[in-house]
Amino acid sequence: MADGLLAMTSSHFCTAERQFRTPLSYGAVRTPTAQWTATAAGACLLRPAGQGVGIRAVTFGRVQDLGIRDINNMGAAMAPAAAATLLRYLTDTNTQPQEFDAICTGDLGHVGSQLFRELLAAEGLLLKNHVDCGSLLYDAEGQSVHSGASGPGCCAAVLCGHLLPRLERRGQHRVLFLATGALMSQTTFLQKESIPAISHLVELAAPEEQNGGNT
């Protein structure tokens, strides 16, 4: 077994725009559901034991595809995957949402977050402690970012720069973190194929709550 593993990811605004939308010089008008890919990064060091924030449980996601084809509405494509993973975790662990200080999704944005809560409400779960990295990263009122931030660097930056420090300081004790991702390519979206999505979950615990590995 390795003594330590470093997990890292990043994303870049201009690169994502050029590959999946339109070149910046084109000046295309964004739809209200569109998100802004974050130029951001984050890295976590995982060890079998230590004094840091602990990982108490993990739930691997399953691919969900509800037929969303709009590349400018990624939150709607990913929300069902996040909802399905959270429901499986709560069922498997026999826990309730209110037992956690926060349930944080990766980059659903404002539109996707609303859909996420609506999907769970249909299953009888009313989330009062849900936050989304895509909604937290930018100032929705002061910046014209439409539905918020997106990209793997978005959730990595919020996790490493905001959530983990709060757990370290005991500002929070138990947090569910759901990374969200879309499974597409430059070819599939141009062919107007549907956008499958997946979401993996980790339960993070402050040092005094931990019972397992550490980050």
Question: What are the residue ranges of the model-derived segments?
Answer:
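Short, well-ordered, mixed-charge alpha-helical segments that flank or form enzyme active sites
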Residues: F13-R18, V63-G67, M184-Q186
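Active-site-adjacent elements of ketosynthase-type condensing enzymes
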Residues: H12-Y26, G112-Q114, V158
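Short, well-ordered beta-to-alpha junction loops that form the rim of enzyme active sites
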Residues: T9-H12, T105-L108, A179-A182
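Conserved catalytic cysteine-centered active-site region
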Residues: M1-D3, H12, A16-E17, G61, ...
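Short glycine/threonine-rich loop-to-helix capping motif typified by GTGT followed
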Residues: L108-E123, T187-S194
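Condensing-enzyme catalytic core mediating Claisen C-C bond formation in acyl metabolism
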Residues: T22-L87, D92-T95, N129-S135, E141, ...
